[in-house]
């Protein structure tokens, strides 16, 4: 009697390391940050994370922070305005200065199942009484080998590292 042995199918994964620099400013506000994947035609394949002021106010149950999401202009125009926030597993509170890691497995929300091809990881930050910055890292999907491409922002973002694993 023969037995069929099933080999587990492992989906490719990616991790994103986002550095938020501590700025020397008299009025410092934590930045709003959006992280998403774009296809080669600049359409959004999936929004991975959106950090914004989620604190609720007694007179505004959704929190006043949602009205400032549009300050992340590129994300907003490419698909953010269609997102009904909050979204479990995607939206969260703003983060303090430092390094923050996000990990995703293909096909497990919020990481979409991607068709093979060229993509960009895009990270956008906008800060009240501050600036706005967009950093992108091109990559091929699915990864054929473990790679760690990086890009560095100039003011609102520090080093952005994409950790791809087949």
Regions found by a protein language model. Give the residues of each.
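Ser/Thr/Pro-rich, acidic low-complexity intrinsically disordered regulatory segments
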Residues: 1-3
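Short amphipathic, basic-aromatic surface patches that mediate peripheral association
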Residues: 16-28, 51-56
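Low-complexity, serine/threonine/proline/glycine-rich extracellular segments that form mucin-like
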Residues: 23-48
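Sec/Tat signal peptide C-region and signal peptidase I cleavage site
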Residues: 5-11
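Short coil-to-beta strand junction motifs in C2/discoidin
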Residues: 27-33, 64, 116-119
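Glycine-rich, aromatic-bearing surface loops/beta-hairpins
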Residues: 97-102, 110-166
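Structured domain cores in non-transmembrane regions
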Residues: 40-114
């Amino acid at each position: 009697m023969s037995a069929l042995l099933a080999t587990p199918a492992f989906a490719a994964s990616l991790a994103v390391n986002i550095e938020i620099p501590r700025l020397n400013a008299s009025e410092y506000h934590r930045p709003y940050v959006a992280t998403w994947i774009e296809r080669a035609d600049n359409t959004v394949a999936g929004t991975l994370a959106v950090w914004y002021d989620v604190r609720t106010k007694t007179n505004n149950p959704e929190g006043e922070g949602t009205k400032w999401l549009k300050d992340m202009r590129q994300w907003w125009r490419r698909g953010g305005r269609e997102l009904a926030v909050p979204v479990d597993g995607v939206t969260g509170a703003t983060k303090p200065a430092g390094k923050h890691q996000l990990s995703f497995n293909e096909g497990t929300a919020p990481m979409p199942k991607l068709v093979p091809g060229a993509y960009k990881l895009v990270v956008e930050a906008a800060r009240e009484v501050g600036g706005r910055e967009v950093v992108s890292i091109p990559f091929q999907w699915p990864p054929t080998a473990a790679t760690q491409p990086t890009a560095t922002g100039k003011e609102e973002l520090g080093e952005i590292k994409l950790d791809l694993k087949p």
